[in-house]
Structure formats: structure tokens, C-alpha cells
């Protein structure tokens, strides 16, 4: 099994798709890396030679920030927004949508499941 950037790539998949299992590499970046290294996108991971694996590893490590480094950078950016008191940081802190989406309805992914509030009680007549 090929191991790139600390991630085991699935053996049966095409290398173009398998590279997207690495955090920070999508389909476009995957194609860029393959073009840069000269490896065919149709090659299966199990058919990669040791030399091809090492060139892939080197190309990804030199060109992109991936996996742990990228995750920590994103986390630090969010923390910085919170620390300086930016509006976006406030939205992150409160667990609300950051990019201007509406919250009167929807936004359930960000807010979590509904918290049911008891309705108003009717006063009984005497």
C-alpha cells in the first residue's frame, strides 16, 4: 500500500482519485501533481513503482502544505480571528454560520439539532 504524507492510499483506485484521500489535495491539485511528475492518471495505486511513489511523495511535500500542517494552520487562523475580536471569530465562537448565511431558518448543520422550547401556557378561567 502506497503511503504519501502519512496517509495510506487505497490500492484498487486510480492514483488521480487516491491522492484526494490526502487532506488538502482535491481533484485539481491531484491532476497538477500527476502532470508535474509525469505519472498517468489512469494508473492504479497497486501498479505504481517504488520510484514513482517516491517522486509523488517528494512533489507533494515540496509543493503543498497537507495533512497536519494544513489542519494546524487553519485552526490557528480561526483562533487568531477569535483572539482579535473579529466578527468572523465571534461567529466561530458562537457556532453560527460565518459567511453571512441566514439563521432565522436553516443553519442546522452549524447550530446542531433543534433545542425545543416550551410554548406559552394558556391561563385557565375561573
Curated annotation (Swiss-Prot):
UniProt keyword list: Ribonucleoprotein, Ribosomal protein, RNA-binding, rRNA-binding, tRNA-binding
GO molecular function annotations of the record: rRNA binding; structural constituent of ribosome; tRNA binding
Residue intervals passing through the bilayer: none
InterPro entries to which the protein is assigned, alphabetical: Rbsml_uS13_C, Ribosomal_uS13, Ribosomal_uS13-like_H2TH, Ribosomal_uS13_bac-type, Ribosomal_uS13_CS
GO annotation terms (biological process): translation
A single GO cellular-component term on record: cytosol
Region spans: Disordered: 92-126
Role, per record: Located at the top of the head of the 30S subunit, it contacts several helices of the 16S rRNA. In the 70S ribosome it contacts the 23S rRNA (bridge B1a) and protein L5 of the 50S subunit (bridge B1b), connecting the 2 subunits; these bridges are implicated in subunit movement. Contacts the tRNAs in the A and P-sites.
Subunit structure: Part of the 30S ribosomal subunit. Forms a loose heterodimer with protein S19. Forms two bridges to the 50S subunit in the 70S ribosome.
Family: Belongs to the universal ribosomal protein uS13 family.
Listed name of the protein: Small ribosomal subunit protein uS13
Gene designation: rpsM
